[in-house]
């Protein structure tokens, strides 16, 4: 582990079409092997599909989906006296949106539609309506945190 100072957060430029940093982070998470143009094409095509099919603002659907999937609690593993405990902790906003985008992308990849554009469009629409696999993942995370509420006095920050 490095003894120098921690690396600073990198500045992410907002995307060109909607001027949104959150959407830019989502595109970066979707990107594989440095092919950002392809990731942008998939996201913007999914937005067009949402707009044509449901006649709603796709950027609003995206924001609702991210907000609905973003977890408020998660569990972290803490070792106390030779035993590991799953301790519920609050999720800060940055990590919450990172988890939400990861969960939406993974849920979209597992869908049965043929093209990624269709998969992403449907998963975003379902997540904005509090349905779908990504919402289930958030609920499972919250249930896990609720089940381990008894260990919340083991604060992960105090143990280190």
UniProtKB/Swiss-Prot annotation:
Matches recorded under Pfam families: Ribosomal_S7
GO cellular component: small ribosomal subunit
SUPFAM superfamilies according to UniProt: Ribosomal protein S7
Transmembrane region(s): none
GO molecular-function term, one example from the UniProt record: structural constituent of ribosome
GO BP: translation
Alphabetized UniProt keyword annotations: Ribonucleoprotein, Ribosomal protein, RNA-binding, rRNA-binding, tRNA-binding
The protein's role, per its UniProt record: One of the primary rRNA binding proteins, it binds directly to 16S rRNA where it nucleates assembly of the head domain of the 30S subunit. Is located at the subunit interface close to the decoding center, probably blocks exit of the E-site tRNA.
Family, per entry: Belongs to the universal ribosomal protein uS7 family.
Record-given protein name: Small ribosomal subunit protein uS7
Organism this protein belongs to: Rickettsia canadensis (strain McKiel)
